Amino acid sequence: MMNYQGWAIFIDGDMILRDDIAKLWELRDESKAVQVVQHDYETKMTEKYLGAKNENYPKKNWSSVILWNCAHPANKTVTPDFVKSATGAEVHRFTWLEDNLVGALPTEWNWLDIEYDYNSDARLVHYTLGTPCFADFAARSGSNYAAEWHRERIYTDYSAQHDLPF
């Protein structure tokens, strides 16, 4: 919690940014302890990548993109001991916060691939059901953004210093 000072951004690792993250940073609201995309949906798939079970539950995927107001007094509850002793549901559902302290971000900042239809304005795409790197999953998933995932992976692996196949 950065010694309970300033702001922080958390994002899951199964995402790609399609816009400048500074634009997300500009959405900070000092009156909120956290800001998230407040998804309200039922999943289209009961199974995720590699056969993982996928269930519906309250505030699903809210904690996958978070603007944390680390200095907000309500976040002083989030200590290492709290995180160690709380259930995953308690942490991911922000149970230490009153509802009015959880601010809303535009859905485009945590666009759920497959769960939502294609959106050319999505600023951050979340491959919450599985990334296209899982070949079996990618072949049957119907991902709207698989090509973008693979393009970004190639850019990540690319080196102008070497003309070697990866």
Where are these regions (language model features)?
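A glycosyltransferase accessory/donor-loop signature
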Residues: V65-F166
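A generic fold-level signal
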Residues: N3, P58-K60, N119
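GT-A fold catalytic core of metal-dependent nucleotide-sugar glycosyltransferases
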Residues: M1-K44
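Short, flexible coil/linker segments at or flanking structured domains
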Residues: D12, N54-N56, R93, D113
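Conserved catalytic core of nucleotide-sugar-dependent glycosyltransferases
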Residues: L27-V91
